[in-house]
Amino acid sequence: MKFLALFVTLLVVLALVSAQKSQNTNHNVIVIGAKKPGAAPAAAAAAAPAAPPAAAPAAAPAAPEAGLADAPAES
């Protein structure tokens, strides 16, 4: 009976350890060298446009309905 209890306990411990290892996949990443504070990630650098952007168009005027929500209702 003691053997069965030890066997079940061992199985439970192994299952818990296995579950924890599968969740901690990013903790064993080795980083060599310090990260530079101004460095951009490679994906962001690749997605950046090669030419400077064109001048932005002027902002459109606000819609006339924008201020009507605060106006009191006329009856």
From Swiss-Prot:
<dbReference type="GO" id="GO:0019953">
    <property type="term" value="P:sexual reproduction"/>
</dbReference>
<feature type="signal peptide">
    <location>
        <begin position="1"/>
        <end position="19"/>
    </location>
</feature>
<comment type="function">
    <text>Transferred from male to female during mating and may affect egglaying and behavior after mating.</text>
</comment>
<dbReference type="GO" id="GO:0005576">
    <property type="term" value="C:extracellular region"/>
</dbReference>
<keyword id="KW-0085">Behavior</keyword>
<keyword id="KW-0964">Secreted</keyword>
<dbReference type="GO" id="GO:0018991">
    <property type="term" value="P:egg-laying behavior"/>
</dbReference>
<keyword id="KW-0732">Signal</keyword>
<feature type="region of interest" description="Disordered">
    <location>
        <begin position="55"/>
        <end position="75"/>
    </location>
</feature>
<dbReference type="GO" id="GO:0045924">
    <property type="term" value="P:regulation of female receptivity"/>
</dbReference>
<dbReference type="GO" id="GO:0005615">
    <property type="term" value="C:extracellular space"/>
</dbReference>
<feature type="compositionally biased region" description="Low complexity">
    <location>
        <begin position="56"/>
        <end position="75"/>
    </location>
</feature>
<protein>
    <recommendedName>
        <fullName>Accessory gland-specific peptide 57Da</fullName>
    </recommendedName>
</protein>
